[in-house]
């Protein structure tokens, strides 16, 4: 059973089936578009190997965030407004599908957090998700920035 779970997790990590040829989704807040690595500004999603607890079940919340993004993008190509570079030389941008901010969508769905250290842009969306116990707000979780420290 553990081997099957491991295979499933690996498959989901690299799942980009159905996406435009010029697009790869790295994780919940990072894409590669036309060879350019783009980090969504103002939000933070759980790391791919990060888990949450829902009832007595362990949930791969980082993979859930990525899969939500894959599903939202579908076979469309995001349009991104670049805002500069981060310390890792990734382009920081807000990206849109059919006029909707992917960052706002992820935060409002409860699988991303307003990254208050850098921006106050998505606080309303986070409050909505928290009040309605959406996504990770319905589980026990560790903030991604705390998870990365451990």
What is the role of each PLM region?
Residues 2-150:
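Small beta-barrel nucleic-acid-binding modules, primarily SNase/OB-fold domains
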């Amino acid at each position: 059973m553990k081997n099957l779970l491991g295979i499933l997790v690996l498959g989901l990590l690299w799942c980009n089936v159905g996406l435009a040829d010029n697009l790869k989704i790295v994780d919940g807040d990072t894409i590669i578009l036309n060879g350019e690595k783009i980090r969504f500004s103002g939000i933070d999603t759980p790391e791919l190997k990060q888990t949450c607890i829902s009832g007595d079940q362990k949930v791969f919340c980082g993979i859930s965030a990525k899969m939500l993004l894959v599903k939202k993008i579908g076979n469309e190509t995001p349009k991104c407004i670049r805002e500069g570079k981060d310390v890792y030389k990734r382009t920081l941008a807000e990206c849109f599908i059919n006029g909707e901010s992917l960052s706002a969508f992820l935060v409002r769905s409860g699988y991303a957090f307003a990254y208050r250290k850098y921006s106050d842009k998505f606080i309303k969306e986070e409050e909505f998700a928290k009040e309605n116990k959406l996504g990770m707000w319905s589980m026990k979780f560790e903030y991604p920035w705390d998870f990365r420290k451990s």
